Design a protein with these regions (language model features):
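Accessory DNA-engaging acidic/polar modules
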Residues: 1-75
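Walker A/P-loop
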Residues: 83-108, 113
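Conserved helix-turn-beta segment of the N-terminal RecA-like "Helicase ATP-binding" lobe
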Residues: 120-145
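Structural beta-sheet core signal
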Residues: 114-115, 139
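Phosphate- and divalent-cation-binding pockets in alpha/beta enzyme and binding domains
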Residues: 38, 100, 124-125
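Conserved two-lobed SF2 helicase motor
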Residues: 147-152
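Pre-Walker A (pre-P-loop) alpha-helix and adjacent loop at the N terminus of AAA/AAA+ ATPase modules
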Residues: 73-84
Length: 152
């Protein structure tokens, strides 16, 4: 069994995985946190059991999926899914990027953090989550500090 941990922006492992280097100081194989997914997949594909102590996620209640996508939004979501659920959705203003993101959240049903640059957008996102997914999101910013399974 391999144990994965998080420490100051690093993924630590007691066994080697591609992208990790031995750190004498940490007494573990270490790599930047963005490698987490690849490291975890490497051990899974190698048939190695993983004790994952990296993420301590908040519980996510069941989501209602009332998001309906237009064809071009569905194409954007499908392209994102085919690229390993990574990348950026680029659509013009008013084309429904929020709807695409809400559909992705509903499909994956995993704890989610949405980062926005203004309090107005935080409020808009929270309203959309309530309306389309049927859950009360957490909100951090503008004097609020409540974290939930979906947090804006």
């Amino acid at each position: 069994m391999v144990t994965l941990r998080f420490f100051k922006g690093l993924i630590l492992s007691d066994s080697y995985a591609p992208g990790l280097k031995w750190s004498e100081e940490l007494k573990a194989y270490a790599g930047l946190a963005y490698l987490y997914r690849e490291v975890k997949e490497y051990f899974k594909e190698s048939g190695v059991e993983v004790s994952d102590q990296v993420l301590d996620t908040l519980p996510l209640p069941p989501l209602r999926d009332s998001v309906r996508l237009r064809d071009y939004q569905r194409e954007a979501l499908d392209a994102w899914l085919k690229s390993g659920k990574r990348g950026v959705i680029v659509l013009p203003t008013g084309a429904g990027k929020t709807s695409v993101a809400l559909k992705a959240i509903a499909l994956l049903s995993v704890p989610t953090l949405i980062v926005v640059p203004t309090i107005d957008l935080m409020t808009q996102w929270a309203s959309a989550i309530r309306e389309k997914l049927g859950v009360e999101p957490g909100m951090v910013g503008g004097g609020r500090d409540e974290k939930k399974g979906i947090t804006v």
